[in-house]
Every structure is written in C-alpha cells, then in structure tokens.
Amino acid sequence: TAMYYKVRHYQYKNRIGNLKSEAVGVVSGEKHFPIFPGNMIFKPLTKSKPFSTPLYAYAEVFWSTIINEYFMPAPRYELAICEGYEAVNEKYLDYGTAVPMAYKEGESLLNLLEFFRKYPDEKVDIDNYVNYCQMFYDYRDIFEADFLQEHQEMAEQLAMQVLISVLKGDQNYHYENVAFLCDKDGGIISLAPMIDHEFSTYFMFPDDISRHVYWLMELSKSIRGWEVRPGEYDNFKDSEERKLMEKSATCIHKNLLYIKEHYPQTTEEFLDKAEKLKTALTEASEDFLIRGNTEYPDCADSSAWLIGKARYKDKDEEKASAYEAELYGKGKKLDFRDVSISAINEIKAVISQMEEVLRKRE
C-alpha cells in the first residue's frame, strides 16, 4: 500500500458540470459540488462542518486507500485544490478532495433514508431517525427490513460496510451514508460502494488530546457494549441529545453481535481481512504514515467550525465575529508523523477489540 498524497489542481471555472445532491430530509440544504473531466467530483472542506480540520481530507485518502486494498472496491479520494471555489461559495474552502463518481450515466443513488421513505417498512422507524454527528447508529432494524431479508447478497454487503465503518471509527455513519445504486428506471442494482470517510475518530481533534481520547473511549465502549452508568451523559443538557448518546453508547456492540449471528461468512471474511491489515500496520507501518503535502493547509483548529456555523447556518454575524476573536491564532500546526503513529496504534487496538467481540463463543 503506498498512500498517495499528491494534490490535484482544478480551476472552478473549468468545471464541466455540478453534482446536484439535495441533502434530503434531516440535514437540509443543497450541495453543488463541481465535476471535472474524468468524472471527478471536487468535494470541498466545509467551514461549518463540525470539528473539521485538514485531516478530514487526509482521512478520506487514508481510508479509501485501505478499504480498496484490504476489503472491497471503493472510490479512491485524492487531495485536491479547486481555485476560485471559495470566492463563489464562501461557506466552502478551495481545499478538499477529488473522487471519481460512484455511478455511471443514467444511474443514481438512493440512500437508506430515501429508500425507507419511498418503501416504508414497519420494522424501520424512519420518521424518528435523527442525523446527529458524533453518534453511532443501530443497524439491526435495517437488516430486519423485508428488502434486506429478501436480498441476502446486499445484506451481506451492508454487513461488511457496517463492520468497516466500526473499524474506521466512523463517528457519523448514519442512514444517509449508505446507499443503493439504481438503474435509470429506479430499479436497485446493488449496494453502492463506501464513500465519505471524514469523521474517523483517529483523525479527529488532533489539536485537543483530551477530546480525542474521550471520543476514542466512546468508540471502544460502544464496541465492547459496556453498560451505561447512571448519570454518565448528564453533561448533555438537552434530554433528546442525552437519549441519543445513551443509545449510541452500546449500539456498536449490538450491531456486531447481530452481524456475527446472522452473517457468519461475512464476519469471517472481515476478520481475515482485518487481521491482514493489522499485520501490515505492524510490519510495514511506514507505508501507512500520512505525508503532509506542503501545498495543503497544515493547521488544525477543531473549534473553527463554530465560526462557520454562526456565519453560514445561523446567519449571526455578531456571534461569528465573537468566535473569530476568541479563536484567533488558536490553531495548532499538524505533526503528520505523530498523528499517523497514534492513529496506527489506535486502529490496531480497535481491530483487537472487534476481534474479541466477533470471535467470542457465546
């Protein structure tokens, strides 16, 4: 595995089209990402995306490479700069990633939220689904839905994707991240390949070690299924939010046990592949180091998104300016070697924790 950290350069004015993806439902808003020759989509870093730092882009390169090499075909992300983009769409940066489109002319994607709105299933309570960043999602009801009960192969593919999402410590693997690939008549062909790897625990909060460790522990606890202690989430003042966190705290474990019981072959296949990855991370760790590219930003401030949120989402310029003053110069220069070494160790630990749950004889 050689990780590829060269930067692709685009000019916004040279785009050949725009990918219009209406964010359906829960997080509303339209995204018009530019498309360039070779069917490459430029996906910018967003100023209002929670906890966003340049590592979000590096994480996409890192995980798409690993998923492709060790698990299943997936579109490969590359670092990219699109000059002139921020000038036109100021809530985005000129920095981001470039990724080939996941579907061909005439095809389209239908995510799980859209799917269950179109084909309701009483086992899936889609109306009460919430897209909440930094939360783990329960996939058991989705597997129980008639469509996946009747389509074994797609269910196995989904099981593999859920397992990989746990491995990459995805803090945002919600029902809009999983999609079916549809033909021109809307007929479902297969599960779409995995995209979107930004919210990987190992690459979050590089500038704030205590928060980094807190969320790493949340991931570990959810994998192991440790019971929630009374009052554990009392620091979440909003009762809805608190309920979500309490549910999230054990749901990875439930997903793992469900997949292990219902999809034993996929579980074995995943364990074999994860074991190979763990060996490579140990024996050839140099291959997995993130090489910071000098053309790309190298400063991280996990709170800077609050400025963007105030300015572009809440339209509150006063609040935005206050955050700007408060956070000015707070960013931390990224030490890519340091980040990579700790990420490699954390990933190996998570593989071991997953193995423990998935290999355990009941």
Residue ranges of predicted features:
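Extended low-complexity intrinsically disordered regions
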Residues: 102-142, 226-257
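Conserved kinase catalytic-core segment
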Residues: 55, 132-209, 349
